Amino acid sequence: MKLKVVHRPVDPGHLEGLRTLPPVLARAYAARGIDGPGQLAHTLDRLLRVGSLEGIADAVALLLAHRRADGRVLVVGDFDADGATSSALIVRALRAWGWPEVDFLVPNRFEYGYGLTPEIVDLAAVRAPTLIVTVDNGISSIAGVAAARERGIDVLVTDHHLAGAVLPDANVIVNPNVPGATFGSRCLAGVGVAFYVMSALHRALDDPSLPSPAGWLDLVALGTVADVVPLDHNNRVLVAQGLQRIRAGRCTPGVRALLETGKRSLPGLVAADLGFAAGPRLNAAGRLDDMSIGIRCLITDSPTEALALAARLDQLNQERRAIEGRMQEEAIAAVRHLRDPDGDSGRGRRRHGLCLYDPGWHQGVVGLVAGRLKDRVRRPVIAFADAGAGELRGSARSVTGVHIRDVLDAVATRHPGLLGRFGGHAMAAGLTLPRDRLDEFAVAFDAEVERWQAGGSLADRIETDGPLAADEISLATAETLRAAGPWGQAFPEPSFDQRFRILRTRTVGERHLKMWVEVPGAGRRFDAIAFNFFQGREASEPVPEEALLVYRLDVNEYAGERRLQLLVDHLLE
């Protein structure tokens, strides 16, 4: 596939409103729709009104009713970082605010699958809850909610996933993505929804002696970044506030332990550190073991216990990386030999969507493999693993312009009975499928993705902020951009492109390419690194003497010294 570099358009009117900022930063902000300082304010008073989220007043009333009745609250979470931070936030808040009995339950993904299923309700019923609160799940749990209500258990669904045609018969639903919702942002993560519910509850309690939910914004920032939801202005406020508290050392022992285990310095923390250091360690529990380890890490007030649990999470993350590395190599090899839906060899027409399956793949890691491969082939990818009983469980990752959950919905509509359960977002989704219908599904999926891309694929394009002048490629510029975040999904960290002469290279850690480069004619040389450059490549593959690099500016801290480093995302001849 030939990739095309395109520059993000910059509205001159937006630039005018940002003229007091450094030019590189002003261009980056303007290209992301920022037209003035007001959109850069990250104070809590810039959040969308708590009361404007549909269902929130009813949620508060339900929670207060169970407190008055000395009821038992059971929080049922998802098995990822968003679910873990959501669970920890609500458990911490309710316990701190006087609810007599609050506990959590997170389903083992390998035994129970996703969401509030009837089987999970059976498990929950042993604890005799009067109220189940779902976090980061529940909007598709029709049967599970019904099972709970039949047992006389009230259900409060807090979720952010897209709703299906039928909603569960919960007592209350709080979800900015239900049909007809008018809340000003559809981008809240599950932990963002949980924060809004707890903020409304705290206001209703009207007791200044109770700790503010703002004290747990470190959890909100971690879950929001780790779940890769779009960083609209509302989410940027939540993340910025959480980062501010972490940098000042005002964070939960668990978040501190996860970051210290990941060798991150709290004072200089940026959003990417949450996504690359804390998030994967937390997610590793749900992928390989039991997410209750992660939730316990986030709930404990003991620094010693938090460090011990973080060490266990780090061990699981190392195991996950080893499993993922093997699966990734197998997936790359499979793509090379993939046959097209019409039976021709891979040299035939180009597939639009890829489905991959290996009987030895791990259920908890297929999502990571799909994501890595999607970045490599720049097409939607679904990776499948065996789920037992003749069923496959798949994890889908998509590219810009292809709403993967809607693609699956269209496949289900055109081919009734082909899919089992499915759900998700624009960029990620999960599904189940009979193993003997995988080939049939692969054809249907490819055709549906092709329909979505009928106007041309956006995935073949690499968007950048254009070239930098030689004197703009500097540590000062890198420091400015680093401090200007939070950057993330739908508000990407600035990247640039231009031709460099590659003076010298060496391989680092078997997969990474270290380079020393210079801008032709400028006489300035820079350190650069392309992570995972040799993933799927031969180490002996030659590197050109000159290339178009798509890169970001990074501050490399080592032995107390801060130096500029170029992070190379693409090397194009």
What are these regions, as identified by a protein language model?
Residues 143-147, 369, 476, 480:
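A short acidic, amphipathic alpha-helical/loop segment
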Residues 29, 133, 283, 481, ...:
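A residue-level signal for conserved active-site and pocket-lining positions in enzyme catalytic cores
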Residues 65-71, 233, 237, 305-311, ...:
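Mid-to-C-terminal polyanion-binding domains and interfaces
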Residues 160-161, 362, 425, 512:
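Histidine-centered active-site/metal-ligand motif
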Residues 77, 135, 157, 175-176, ...:
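Flexible glycine-/small-residue-rich
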Residues 65, 162-175, 255, 517-522:
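Acidic-glycine-rich active-site phosphate/pyrophosphate-binding loop
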Residues 122-187, 191, 195-207, 211:
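Active-site cavity-forming subdomains of large catalytic enzyme subunits
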Residues 8-130, 151, 203-436, 467:
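Hydrophobic helix-and-loop "lid/oligomerization" segment in the mid-to-C-terminal part
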